[in-house]
Amino acid sequence: LKIVKPEDITEHINDEVAVIMLTEADYRTGRIYDMKNITQLGHRSGALVIWDLAHTAGVLPIKLSEAKADFAVGCTYKYLNGGPGSPAFIYIAPNHINKVEPALFGWHGHKNPFEFNLNYLPSSGIEKMKIGSPSIISFASLKHALDIWDNIDMNELRLKSIELSELFISEIDKLSIDLNLVSPRDPYFRGNQVSYSLENGYAFMQALIQENLIGDFRSPNLIRFGFSPIYLDEQDIITVSYTHLTLPTN
């Protein structure tokens, strides 16, 4: 296992690397990796490429087939609005599906699940990746949360999220508070997440939450904000920026 700096990823892709695993948007900084380019580099070196879409599904246009990604995984409780405990998902490229064996076996992934055969025989296609009985309440919540996506243009959503995050950064820049931007300044190199470093970040975020403005803290000193145009607008950005001004940073 080799962990490298985000800016050095492409320099370390060579024929000694068998598998490349990346989060499309870094969970700390929001930095976006070029999925298509990195996947191509990986394939040229003979590596498989696995993408984690936890911080991009629901806010960025994702084109796994176009990028020729081998595998992808993600969650639905973030920007897909499935809520706590909602199901995860997995993608396997068609050229791999017949060769893949699930690491976790479950009766829902069995070829004939209701025969209750003592010998496991995997189903065909992506169905074999199912495990056991799901939480029906979580599935029901997710089903309704996903209904809205049929009528949403992801490219338009992405542009709107850039507008919101740019507005937020510009408003924070005007304030005389000790917040240091750690996300890329260029909006096309970050997801819809904006992160700052702050010495007393945990206490500061708790104070924001008390004002019903919910961001996130990650050790040792990062505070994170996500901007989904599905439920946020410009007035929300102005409100949270003004609240920053009224809160102490120490």
Where are these regions (language model features)?
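Active-site phosphate-binding strand-loop segment of PLP-dependent enzymes
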Residues: K2-G58, Y79
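Conserved PLP-binding active-site segment of the aspartate aminotransferase-like
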Residues: M21-T23, G191-E199, M205, L213-S241
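Structural detector of well-ordered beta-strand residues that form the stable sheet scaffold
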Residues: I50-D52, V73, E101, V182, ...
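Conserved active-site segment immediately N-terminal to the catalytic lysine
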Residues: W51-L53, A57, K63-I92
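Active-site C-terminal subdomain of aminotransferase-like
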Residues: N81-G85, Y91-K160, E166
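Conserved PLP-binding catalytic core of the aspartate aminotransferase-like
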Residues: I162-I169, D173-E211
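Conserved small/polar residues in nucleotide/adenosyl-binding loops
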Residues: T243-T249
